[in-house]
Design a protein with these regions (language model features):
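Rhodanese-like catalytic fold shared by cysteine-dependent sulfurtransferases
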Residues: 1-35, 42-77, 81-120
Length: 120
């Protein structure tokens, strides 16, 4: 999928403010208790997602996250399809006071390509 230049510029600007982790790091951190949150569209989630992930769509994450993860120091790993939307969502959560939120680089495509565990 080709992305518009303005969108890519926004992502790059936000990437400078958001920490990213690899799929391997995300798996290790999730196994140690971090919250792994899939922010893709509901149809993407239903087609398959990372084992152990929970769903909070990007369209509602700012509205719903405090009810799902009230501890603003909790470790949160966000992922989307390719690692772009999750950067934007991580930035938004940081602005809301979450101190330990990261974006998983490469997103679902990288998770799947590496053969990490999935469920549907």
């Amino acid at each position: 999928m080709s992305h518009a230049p303005g969108f890519l510029a926004l992502i790059e600007a936000k990437r400078a403010q958001v920490r990213e982790v690899s799929v391997a790091q995300a798996r290790d951190r999730a196994a140690a208790g971090a919250r792994l949150i899939d922010i893709r569209e509901q149809s993407e989630w239903a087609a398959g997602h990372a084992s152990g992930a929970e769903y909070v769509g990007k369209g509602v994450i700012e509205r719903d996250i405090e009810g799902r993860v009230p501890n603003k120091d909790a470790e949160i790993i966000l992922y989307c399809g390719g690692g772009f939307r999750s950067v934007l969502a991580a930035d938004a959560l940081q602005q809301m006071g979450y101190t330990n939120v990261v974006s998983m680089a490469g997103g679902w495509r990288e998770w799947n390509a590496l053969g990490a565990p999935t469920e549907a």
